[in-house]
Regions:
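Acidic, low-complexity intrinsically disordered segments
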Residues: 1-204
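Radical SAM enzyme core and accessory elements
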Residues: 2-5, 35-41, 53-57, 77-80, ...
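Flexible glycine/acidic-rich beta-alpha junction loops that bind and position SAM and/or redox cofactors
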Residues: 8, 12-13, 94-98, 175, ...
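Alpha-helical structural signal in soluble globular domains
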Residues: 32, 36, 77, 81, ...
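A structural preference for short, hydrophobic beta-strand core positions in alpha/beta folds
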Residues: 41-43, 87, 240, 288, ...
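Hydrophobic residues within beta-strands of alpha/beta enzymes
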Residues: 58, 106, 180, 210-212, ...
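Structural recognition of alpha->loop->beta junctions
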Residues: 98-117, 254-263, 304-319
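Radical SAM [4Fe-4S] cluster-binding motif and immediate context
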Residues: 145-294, 298-307
């Protein structure tokens, strides 16, 4: 039996450096497919999709809302050819009803320990329209090593440099941030993987640069420290989302190879200034993630925010426009206030204004988004800042400072 696993193309942010990371969702899903089944993986962002080759079953993995329209197009084409099509992934969980119009079956939730029965249903011509495991999570111990051998790593380099591999040490998130749908998708409970499973997976990856994609590592101080102790002997360098603002945690993170952190910058406070400084004190670089268009943002505030980012010496910054994704508090509030402009999901890529801001016009917010990118990278382009981060990896002493070796 042969499965064709497709990761549809989506519109990238205009200002981002053109590099591509190996997708995580498809390789995690592939690990739940029985070993005796052949998998052909196509990342449409990196190679053309041949819609005429033969397979037994088509699986379409969608992470982003802006990816969904193309995924639906692909599903329609294969179904018109008589192929059975199953959809899964984050975007499917956010848009199940729409996806069902383009699918023979949709899988909602996490696939570990569950997908073998879907395969049996397919073989017996009893495929169900919906497999709904939302908030019904498999045992965390059942999450094994992702199946990365389906990837063509030649697609995931930038100027000859191999990009980071993605991996997770936990699922779920105890926080409930207003623009985020993680609580709906993965639950509000922190679900850490066993340390031996995490170490086994990290050790299996033929890459010394990793991205630990957990929504936040700062959910359990004791767990963080034990995780960093466990992975330190692997001597890999990694980036992640926030780490606990604690000297002991930061010390062990640095020793374990923390390279840089994606840190939300939500205001111009001394708290943020000190948060960035403390990362850097431990040799950890910082990429700020900044959402523009909040209800208290006006033109003057956004311009002062960009000035502040330059003052605190961020290594990188990624600007996005507040986007009302389904199943977020932002969506609920804006839907109730009738501030959502349209539901053209291709535009929901966090680089286009799809709602009515409170303190400015849609056009002005789009202009300020462009201003933020252009101003922050005026003196040193993004590609050079990124090159500087990669150069750090060649010098261990620039990553781990004298006091925390």
């Amino acid at each position: 039996m042969k499965i064709k696993l497709i990761y549809p193309k989506w519109p990238k942010l205009e200002f981002q450096t053109e590099f591509h990371l190996p997708p995580h969702g498809p390789v995690v899903f592939a690990a739940s497919i029985p070993e005796n089944i052949d998998i052909e993986f196509v990342d449409e962002n990196r190679e053309p999709l041949d819609l005429n080759d033969d397979c037994d079953l088509v699986c379409i993995s969608m992470m982003l809302t802006s990816q969904a329209p193309r995924g639906w197009e692909i599903g329609d084409i294969y179904r018109s050819k008589g192929k059975k099509v199953i959809f899964g992934g984050i975007a499917v969980m956010l848009h199940p009803e729409e996806t069902m119009k383009h699918a023979d079956s949709v899988f909602l939730g996490e696939t570990e320990t569950r997908f073998e029965s879907v395969i049996e249903d397919f073989k017996n011509n009893k495929l169900k329209p919906v497999y709904n495991y939302m908030q019904d999570f498999p045992p965390i111990e059942s999450i094994g090593t992702a199946k990365r051998n389906i990837l063509n790593y030649n697609h995931y380099t930038y100027k000859g440099v191999k990009m980071v591999d993605l991996v997770h040490a936990s699922r779920g998130c105890k926080f409930n941030c207003f623009p985020c749908c993680t609580g709906y998708l993965g639950g509000r409970k922190f679900r850490p993987r066993p340390f031996d499973k995490v170490v086994e997976e990290l050790a299996s990856i033929n890459n010394d640069k990793l991205f630990i994609v957990d929504n936040s590592l700062a959910q359990d101080k004791k767990w963080e420290i034990e995780l960093f102790k466990a992975i330190a002997p692997l001597k890999k360098k990694w980036c992640c989302h926030p780490i606990e603002d604690d000297d002991e945690v930061l010390k062990y993170a640095s020793k374990a190879g923390a390279w840089y952190v994606y840190q939300a910058i939500f205001d111009t406070s001394d708290y943020i200034r000190n948060r960035v400084k403390r990362y850097k004190d431990y040799g950890i670089a910082v990429e700020g993630t900044i959402i523009l268009g909040l209800d208290d943002h006006d033109e003057d505030y956004i311009k002062r925010l960009v000035d502040f980012l330059l003052e605190i010496d961020l290594d990188l910054a990624e600007f996005t426009i507040l986007t009302p994704y389904p199943h977020t508090k932002t969506w609920a509030d804006m839907h109730k206030e009738k501030r959502i402009l349209h539901y053209n999901w291709r535009d929901y890529n966090a680089g286009k204004v799809v709602f009515k801001p409170k303190l400015m016009s849609e056009k002005k917010l789009q202009e300020l988004y462009n201003y933020a990118w252009n101003t922050f990278y005026k003196d040193e382009p993004q590609r050079l800042k990124m090159a500087r981060l990669f150069k750090q990896l060649k010098n261990k002493n620039s990553i781990i400072k004298e006091g925390v070796k």
